[in-house]
């Protein structure tokens, strides 16, 4: 019953009022400082199709990100409501602070290294906010949503606060080959049947689920074949995340994009089905100093 009342878990504000906020120049430097992965990171991602990496971003940079996203949300949506899932796309084209986080070479290099590709382009950014009481995110994999003719697609999920289980962090099915287990289930977003079939299959097959909290500064990367979900936000605080999706340079748009792919022409303007996805809105994010 969706009207059933749940106890709201009260959390303190995500960031202390005493926190010293770094300058914009310091943030830019942090977001362009390379993060070197270890072999264990590559092995884990290769096996499981996702990875959570701690301490990628500082508490100061996340405080700035959260503040900026809150301003954007307040401009677009009425505030002080409950239960809603709010999203905003392509904010990097309008907001210079969000732009630094979306085009960050520190983050894009990690994504490229995990995919083991040399050049990576941006598909889009997506601000995702769950208000207090907002329900769970159904099981899905991103391959249905991006009309790209490549397996080299990856999304980084940057929570703009520490995200305990009660707040609804991203959760992942593992290893990545559970994709084969459910690939014949027809995707649909018109009802809950797809989500229920996936969940039932995973339960029957005793699939492992990584559903732990995200510490402050911890971010995740997941392949477009990775099945993931997120829980309900049972806290009194807004759960905010910035999700950026990247793909290998040279990838083409599939020949017959469907409605599931959404408004893909907004993200790859001027490119026809079968064409190379390299519009002005798909800059190369890694390596840096490469002409698009």
Give residue ranges: language-model regions.
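A generic structural micro-feature
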Residues: 148-152, 204, 236-238
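A structural signal for short, well-ordered beta-strand segments and their strand-loop junctions
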Residues: 52-54, 121-124, 155, 169-172, ...
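Non-heme Fe(II)/2-oxoglutarate
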Residues: 1-2, 6-31, 73, 79, ...
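Residues that flank catalytic or metal-binding motifs in active/ligand-binding sites
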Residues: 94, 123, 152, 156, ...
């Amino acid at each position: 019953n969706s009207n059933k009342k749940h106890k709201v878990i009260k959390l303190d504000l995500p960031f202390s009022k005493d926190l010293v906020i770094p300058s914009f120049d310091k943030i830019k430097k942090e977001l362009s400082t390379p993060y070197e992965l270890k072999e264990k990171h590559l092995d884990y991602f290769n096996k499981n199709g996702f990875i959570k990496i701690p301490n990628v971003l500082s508490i100061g940079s996340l405080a700035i990100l959260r503040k900026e996203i809150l301003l954007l949300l307040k401009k677009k949506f009425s505030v002080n409501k409950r239960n809603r899932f709010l999203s905003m796309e392509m904010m990097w084209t309008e907001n210079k602070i969000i732009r630094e986080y979306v085009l960050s070479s520190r983050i894009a290099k990690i994504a490229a290294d995990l995919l083991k590709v040399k050049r990576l382009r941006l598909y889009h950014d997506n601000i995702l906010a769950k208000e207090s009481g907002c329900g769970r995110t159904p099981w899905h994999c991103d391959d249905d949503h991006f009309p790209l003719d490549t397996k080299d697609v990856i999304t980084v999920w940057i929570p703009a606060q520490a995200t305990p289980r009660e707040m609804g962090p991203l959760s992942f099915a593992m290893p990545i080959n559970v994709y084969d287990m459910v690939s014949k289930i027809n995707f649909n977003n018109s009802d809950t049947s797809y989500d229920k079939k996936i969940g039932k299959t995973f339960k029957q097959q005793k699939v492992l689920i990584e559903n732990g909290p995200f510490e402050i500064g911890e971010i995740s990367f997941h392949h477009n074949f990775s099945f993931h979900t997120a829980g309900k936000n049972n806290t009194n605080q807004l759960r905010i995340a910035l999700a950026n999706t990247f793909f290998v340079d040279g990838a083409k748009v599939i020949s017959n994009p469907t409605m599931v792919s959404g408004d893909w022409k907004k993200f790859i303007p001027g490119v026809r089905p079968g064409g190379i996805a390299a519009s002005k809105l798909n800059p190369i994010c890694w390596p840096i100093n490469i002409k698009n």
